[in-house]
Amino acid sequence: HLDVTDEKTRELQAQYITDYFKTSSYPVIIGGDFNAEPNSKVIKKIMARHWWDATDSALTFPAWEPKVKIDYLYARPQKGWRVVRTQAVHSLLSDHLPIISELEYVRE
Protein backbone atom coordinates (compact mmCIF):
# COMPACT_ATOMS: atom_id res chain seq x y z
CA HIS A 1 0.00 0.00 0.00
CA LEU A 2 1.70 3.15 -1.21
CA ASP A 3 0.96 6.52 0.40
CA VAL A 4 -2.53 7.80 -0.30
CA THR A 5 -1.85 11.56 -0.28
CA ASP A 6 1.69 12.41 -1.39
CA GLU A 7 3.02 11.55 -4.85
CA LYS A 8 6.68 12.13 -3.90
CA THR A 9 6.32 9.69 -1.00
CA ARG A 10 4.76 7.11 -3.37
CA GLU A 11 7.70 7.56 -5.75
CA LEU A 12 10.20 6.96 -2.92
CA GLN A 13 8.26 3.92 -1.69
CA ALA A 14 8.11 2.45 -5.21
CA GLN A 15 11.84 3.09 -5.68
CA TYR A 16 12.61 1.28 -2.43
CA ILE A 17 10.50 -1.73 -3.43
CA THR A 18 11.90 -1.98 -6.96
CA ASP A 19 15.50 -1.50 -5.73
CA TYR A 20 15.00 -4.26 -3.16
CA PHE A 21 14.24 -6.82 -5.87
CA LYS A 22 16.56 -5.44 -8.57
CA THR A 23 19.27 -8.07 -8.08
CA SER A 24 17.01 -11.06 -7.48
CA SER A 25 17.89 -14.04 -9.63
CA TYR A 26 14.34 -15.34 -9.19
CA PRO A 27 11.12 -14.19 -10.85
CA VAL A 28 9.28 -11.74 -8.58
CA ILE A 29 5.63 -10.69 -8.37
CA ILE A 30 4.51 -7.72 -6.28
CA GLY A 31 1.01 -6.38 -5.95
CA GLY A 32 -1.25 -4.07 -4.08
CA ASP A 33 -2.74 -0.63 -3.80
CA PHE A 34 -0.30 1.75 -5.47
CA ASN A 35 -2.68 4.74 -5.16
CA ALA A 36 -1.61 5.86 -8.63
CA GLU A 37 -3.30 5.81 -12.01
CA PRO A 38 -1.58 4.25 -15.05
CA ASN A 39 -0.26 7.57 -16.43
CA SER A 40 1.12 8.80 -13.11
CA LYS A 41 4.84 9.43 -12.49
CA VAL A 42 5.12 6.57 -10.01
CA ILE A 43 3.68 3.98 -12.39
CA LYS A 44 5.82 5.24 -15.28
CA LYS A 45 8.92 4.95 -13.07
CA ILE A 46 8.05 1.37 -12.08
CA MET A 47 7.66 0.43 -15.73
CA ALA A 48 10.95 2.18 -16.59
CA ARG A 49 12.68 -0.04 -14.01
CA HIS A 50 11.80 -3.10 -16.11
CA TRP A 51 8.70 -4.33 -14.29
CA TRP A 52 5.83 -5.81 -16.29
CA ASP A 53 2.22 -4.85 -15.55
CA ALA A 54 0.50 -8.21 -15.05
CA THR A 55 -2.99 -6.73 -14.81
CA ASP A 56 -5.33 -5.59 -17.51
CA SER A 57 -7.10 -2.25 -17.48
CA ALA A 58 -9.60 -3.37 -14.83
CA LEU A 59 -10.96 -0.52 -12.76
CA THR A 60 -10.56 -1.25 -9.06
CA PHE A 61 -11.56 1.83 -7.05
CA PRO A 62 -13.94 2.53 -5.40
CA ALA A 63 -15.33 -0.97 -5.03
CA TRP A 64 -18.98 0.13 -5.07
CA GLU A 65 -18.57 2.04 -8.38
CA PRO A 66 -15.09 1.44 -9.87
CA LYS A 67 -13.86 4.43 -11.88
CA VAL A 68 -10.05 4.23 -11.72
CA LYS A 69 -7.25 1.68 -11.79
CA ILE A 70 -4.91 2.11 -8.82
CA ASP A 71 -4.28 -1.53 -7.87
CA TYR A 72 -1.66 -3.56 -9.73
CA LEU A 73 0.33 -6.74 -10.00
CA TYR A 74 3.87 -6.30 -11.33
CA ALA A 75 6.30 -8.99 -12.37
CA ARG A 76 10.03 -9.06 -12.98
CA PRO A 77 11.85 -9.85 -15.21
CA GLN A 78 9.81 -7.89 -17.70
CA LYS A 79 9.88 -10.61 -20.38
CA GLY A 80 8.77 -14.22 -20.23
CA TRP A 81 5.41 -13.71 -18.53
CA ARG A 82 1.99 -14.49 -19.90
CA VAL A 83 -1.40 -13.71 -18.36
CA VAL A 84 -3.51 -16.86 -18.37
CA ARG A 85 -6.42 -14.92 -16.88
CA THR A 86 -7.00 -11.90 -14.69
CA GLN A 87 -10.05 -10.23 -13.22
CA ALA A 88 -11.19 -7.71 -10.67
CA VAL A 89 -13.57 -9.49 -8.29
CA HIS A 90 -16.73 -7.58 -7.40
CA SER A 91 -16.82 -7.47 -3.62
CA LEU A 92 -17.57 -4.86 -0.99
CA LEU A 93 -15.23 -6.32 1.65
CA SER A 94 -12.82 -3.44 0.93
CA ASP A 95 -12.98 -0.04 -0.71
CA HIS A 96 -10.90 -1.58 -3.55
CA LEU A 97 -11.78 -4.52 -5.78
CA PRO A 98 -9.32 -7.40 -5.40
CA ILE A 99 -7.44 -8.57 -8.48
CA ILE A 100 -7.00 -12.27 -9.15
CA SER A 101 -4.50 -13.26 -11.83
CA GLU A 102 -3.08 -16.51 -13.07
CA LEU A 103 0.33 -15.98 -14.64
CA GLU A 104 2.74 -18.24 -16.45
CA TYR A 105 6.49 -17.64 -16.55
CA VAL A 106 8.78 -19.18 -19.14
CA ARG A 107 12.44 -18.60 -18.37
CA GLU A 108 14.26 -17.49 -21.50
Tell me the role of every PLM-derived stretch:
Residues H1-E108:
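Active-site regions of metal-assisted phosphoester/phosphodiester hydrolases
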